[in-house]
Amino acid sequence: MKAFFLTLFRQQAVLIKKMSRVAITLVIVLCAIVAIFRVWAFYTESPWTRDAKFTADVVAIAPDVSGLLSDVRVTDNQLVNKGDVLFVIDQPRYHQAVAQAEADVAYYQALVTEKRRESGRRARLGISAMSQENIDQSSNALETATHQLAKAQVVLSLAQLELERTVVRAPADGWVTNLHVQSGEFIERGNTAVALVKKDSFYLLAYMEETKLEGVRRGYRAEITPLGSEKIFYGTVDSVAAGVNNSSSSANNKGLANVDSNLEWVRLAQRVPVKIRLDRQMGDLYPAGTTATVVITGEQVNNDKKPSPLIRLLYRLREFG
């Protein structure tokens, strides 16, 4: 009897061991299926793109007057404040123009005074002392001198404005970049001398595939991972472009964004620009034009929650497509 129970116990132990192995295998397979499904959904179904660019408002600064650059007061990539002097253009010439215009105004002021006095005197004498034609000529001369004075005053105002425009100032806070002028060079009116990347104007342009736009709405939150970084930043969808250029048509794009396909012989989903506002400005960390990966997470996201190692790994894999 003892041997029977011992054999039965051993058989039950073997059965339990086999069942444990099967259960463990099933759990592992189930976990693998769940993980694969999450990776597949995260990688293919969620609205995301690795083709996103940090972008900023850029002001092309060009002088409103022509002349020699007498002083360049900034260096390339320097941070400047609104109103700071960037460069100065040949002021002596424009000082002379103002002086000449002031002299013309003074001359015509004296001429108007003289013509007004003469016209008044002839009007008081009347036709008893001279002909009506002489009286009319005096009145016309006064009117002509008055118009000449007004014209001279306008010329003076323009000369003063041009003198003021010889000092080119920063229109906003930002970084001076692509500076390609030096003191002593002659610069033409309207020719761009430097670009100013406006501070606190950075945003993200994410080029989303049209097949994923259904999950993109104004106000949705976005997770942003700069290329080569494990840091995640956050933003909000501001808008989706209302149209892009039709690359299949030869018609004029009429100002619409032109987004080229990667491979012309494969039917690819059209990419549409999506503008994303950043929660905080990062112009000092990621210059305009640098790349990031963007995931649209929906209406809410916990900014304080750190991503899991799996999520960080998936972000890294997305950088490689």
UniProtKB/Swiss-Prot annotation:
The chain crosses the membrane at residues 22-42. Its main location: membrane. It is found in: Cell inner membrane. GO terms for cellular component: plasma membrane. The keyword Cell membrane applies. InterPro entries: CusB-like_dom_1 (IPR043602), CusB_D23 (IPR032317), MFP_Efflux_Pump (IPR050393), PHBA_efflux_pump_AaeA (IPR022871), RND_pump_MFP (IPR006143). It is a single-pass membrane protein. GO terms for molecular function: transmembrane transporter activity. Keywords: Cell inner membrane, Cell membrane, Membrane, Transmembrane, Transmembrane helix, Transport. The keyword Nucleotide-binding does not apply. It comes from the Bacteria. Pfam families: CusB_dom_1 (PF00529), HlyD_D23 (PF16576). Belongs to the membrane fusion protein (MFP) (TC 8.A.1) family. NCBIfam families: PRK10559.1, RND_mfp. Forms an efflux pump with AaeB. This is p-hydroxybenzoic acid efflux pump subunit AaeA.
